[in-house]
Design a protein with these regions (language model features):
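Mid-domain alpha/beta scaffold segments of enzyme catalytic cores
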Residues: 1-126, 146-148, 168-170, 177, ...
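Catalytic pocket-lining loop regions of alpha/beta-barrel enzymes
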Residues: 106-212
């Protein structure tokens, strides 16, 4: 870039880009990786500067498919063998109808679901990481997942999603106490790291989006 920052390379995280509506979900997640790998190849030409765009790719895969997800993971790797690094599973949901779920529409308790665990077990043999996007009430479930699979690298997204809307409105102290307790416990899992960002979303309840 010309901003003065020396951005050597970037990592792409799944966002449902370029899904073909005529394809099944198994094919759609591969559509995205194919698209992003093409952008990375364009970047590698050097025509757009020195920064290596999408040098790492984190895609999506339906781990609730259990053992059947293995073929999907292998297709991701075959499409981008040098760049594909892991998957993200969007588990962020809450039964409170005033709190939006992610576009993935996850089921409740997905991180402790047996079929999910069956699918999750296919990450370690392929040296793939796991990006966890959940709300703070789901942190205990993520702790269970991290302990069950200690050899799989887990990256916590968005500070663990502290909520400040819906039934959590005006409950900052209660929310922080719960969040702090479980973030501290999660930090004891040596296979877990945290990615900083995503604390200014509407769901966090700071209402910064209303400022003029």
């Amino acid at each position: 870039t010309e901003s003065g920052h020396n951005i050597v390379s970037t990592v792409f995280i799944e966002c449902g880009a370029m899904y073909n509506p005529e394809h099944s979900i198994e094919e759609q997640v591969i559509n995205e990786t194919e698209f992003v790998n093409g952008i990375a190849a364009m970047s590698n030409s050097g025509l757009y500067g020195k920064t290596k765009i999408a040098e790492g790719i984190v895609g999506s895969a339906p781990l609730l498919f259990g053992d059947k997800v293995a073929n999907i993971l292998d297709k991701h790797i075959s499409v981008a063998p040098k760049r594909f690094k892991g998957i993200r599973s969007q588990a962020a949901m809450h039964p409170d109808g005033t709190i939006p779920s992610t576009r993935a529409r996850p089921i409740e308790g997905v991180y402790i679901n047996d079929m999910f665990h069956q699918g999750f077990a296919h990450l370690e043999p392929r040296n793939l990481s796991f990006e966890a996007w959940c709300y703070h009430p789901q942190l205990p479930q993520l702790i269970q997942l991290a302990r069950k699979f200690p050899n799989t690298s887990i990256i916590l997204n968005h500070f663990g999603g502290p909520l400040g809307i819906g039934s959590f409105t005006d409950k900052e102290e209660e929310t922080y106490s719960f969040w702090e307790k479980h973030i501290t416990e999660l930090s004891k899992c040596e296979n877990v790291v945290a990615k900083l960002g995503g604390i200014a979303m509407e769901i966090n309840g700071f209402k910064w989006h209303l400022n003029k």
